[in-house]
Design a protein with these regions (language model features):
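Catalytic-site microenvironment of enzymes
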Residues: 2-275
Length: 275
């Protein structure tokens, strides 16, 4: 379940032009933004195909990644970090739990690793905020609430050290009714975040989920991380753990790689227009 849902007590079971109880969505983009997005779409069509093919190769070797890296991975030495990959939740804060018992934080980490791997193969310096299924809280934090607050503060602090990098936060969705499915991208209030979210949402629809009619939407102010960093930032709800079919897909390594590939393609296809 996405961080914003748990804090608001509202889940994303609505699509298209529907609205939630706790916040309203932004109006449709103006003509200039639509024109800009059209250029991004044109480039991402071919880029998505290439990254999807690359993702298939990467998926076969990701399990060989070194397991001894620290929980909060250091920035690549001598390189300017362009992307920050955030696997949502972790440790005691597992996030949502599917009807079959699958914990969200583990799926988030698997997809985030793949996104990071694709960035690496494409020569895009990236930093993962966590590389293990643990919380990033300070040792002084004792209660679950203290640990969660400390964890989010530390993630925000790390991201803020690289203000020119864009943050991509990976989460999973949850709803009381099982029929809802599909990827949904939310964006931070910082400049360039909306365009980045639109690029990712567009590639998802064109390359992986043609039936997905969702549009990218603004993140509510209650989501701490996305509202306490200077970076361009998006939160990607990859799918619904409450949907039996999608629950199975989200646990499939091949599908995780496809998701990572379209997320990376959206980022890379739109990045030059967003800097």
């Amino acid at each position: 379940m996405g961080e914003f849902e748990r804090r608001n007590g509202e889940t994303d079971g609505k699509t298209g032009g529907e609205t939630k109880k706790y916040f309203s969505y932004a109006a449709a983009a103006d003509h200039s933004l639509k024109g800009r997005w059209g250029l991004v779409r044109g480039r991402t069509r071919w880029l998505a195909a290439g990254v999807l093919a690359l993702g298939a190769v990467i998926g076969g070797v990701l399990w060989r990644l070194e397991e001894s890296v620290s929980a909060a991975a250091p920035a690549p030495a001598g390189l300017e970090v362009r992307w920050i990959v955030d696997a949502g939740h972790g440790g005691e804060d597992g996030g949502a739990v599917s009807p079959g018992g699958m914990v969200e934080s583990r799926i988030n980490l698997e997809i985030a690793r793949r996104v990071d791997g694709i960035f690496g193969f494409c020569g895009e310096p990236a930093l993962m905020l966590r590389t293990e299924d643990i919380s990033l809280h300070d040792p002084e934090a004792v209660t679950l609430r203290e640990k969660k607050a400390s964890d989010l503060h530390n993630r925000a602090q790390t991201a803020s050290e690289y203000p020119e990098a864009a943050l991509v936060s990976i989460h999973q969705n949850m709803f009381q009714q099982s029929r809802y499915r599909g990827t949904q991208v939310f964006y931070a209030p910082t400049q360039g975040s909306q365009e980045l979210a639109q690029a990712i949402q567009g590639v998802v629809r064109e390359s992986l989920q043609p039936e997905n009619s969702r549009e990218s939407k603004p993140i509510p102010s209650t989501v701490y991380l996305m509202n306490h960093i200077p970076n361009r930032a998006v939160l990607v709800e990859c799918g619904f753990l409450s949907n039996p079919e999608e629950e199975g897909l989200l646990q499939d390594p091949k599908y995780q790689t496809k998701l990572a590939a379209v997320i990376a393609a959206g980022c890379l296809g739109g990045s030059s227009d967003l800097t």
